[in-house]
């Protein structure tokens, strides 16, 4: 029990404060940087900050769900999804740096809240936990679609990162459904969307 607590605490510290690492090459790494005006550059950096905070939330959600999951297949899928979300963290962190931006100052708050939510979802049972994962990924996919629409057309580097993230999120949702995810009730899905809007609006600025 103590060993597991140490492992989980270490994971939280690394997610929040250590540079994230990616096994896969960063999407758009070979694409030449395009000159963006100051306003566009700040806007894209803010969008990527929102995406980075979203990945912080995903890490905490999956950590909480994994801690309370009972089925080994569910634990494995959560671990695999978490690994890919770590890559997303690395990609968005790198892009924020390239654009001269910064990460959200509220990331520890997002992490703590998402960890608690993940623990709660896991306590409801594996199929409901998978349903939570699938719905989270669907909403993230829709959110990334919106970001693609708001990117400057010439910013191909950011576009490639977001498109790969979107493909990964869709795959996570498909796997969760294949493992028997329950569809979440509409009020719960609506509450998730409301919470996501609060996070994205705040992380864009802070």
From Swiss-Prot:
What does the note under cofactor report? Answer: Binds 2 iron ions per subunit.
Please report the record's description of how this protein sits within the membrane. Answer: Peripheral membrane protein
Q: Which domain of life is it from?
A: Bacteria
GO cellular component terms, A-Z = plasma membrane
Its GO biological process annotations read: ubiquinone biosynthetic process
Which molecular function GO terms apply here?
3-demethoxyubiquinol 3-hydroxylase activity; metal ion binding
EC assignment: the record states 1.14.99.60
Per the record, the pathway is: Cofactor biosynthesis; ubiquinone biosynthesis
Residues bound to Fe cation 1 are: 55, 85, 88, 169
- Chief localization: membrane
The UniProt entry, under SUPFAM superfamilies, shows:
Ferritin-like
Q: State the reactions this protein catalyses.
A: a 5-methoxy-2-methyl-3-(all-trans-polyprenyl)benzene-1,4-diol + AH2 + O2 = a 3-demethylubiquinol + A + H2O
Instruction: Please list the residues that bind Fe cation 2.
Output: 85, 137, 169, 172
UniProt KW Cell membrane keyword: yes
What InterPro entries does the annotation carry?
Answer: COQ7_proteobact, Ferritin-like, Ferritin-like_SF, Ubq_synth_Coq7
Q: What is the protein's known function?
A: Catalyzes the hydroxylation of 2-nonaprenyl-3-methyl-6-methoxy-1,4-benzoquinol during ubiquinone biosynthesis.
Q: What's the name of the protein?
A: 3-demethoxyubiquinol 3-hydroxylase
**Annotated source species:** Aromatoleum aromaticum (strain DSM 19018 / LMG 30748 / EbN1)
* Designated gene of the protein: coq7
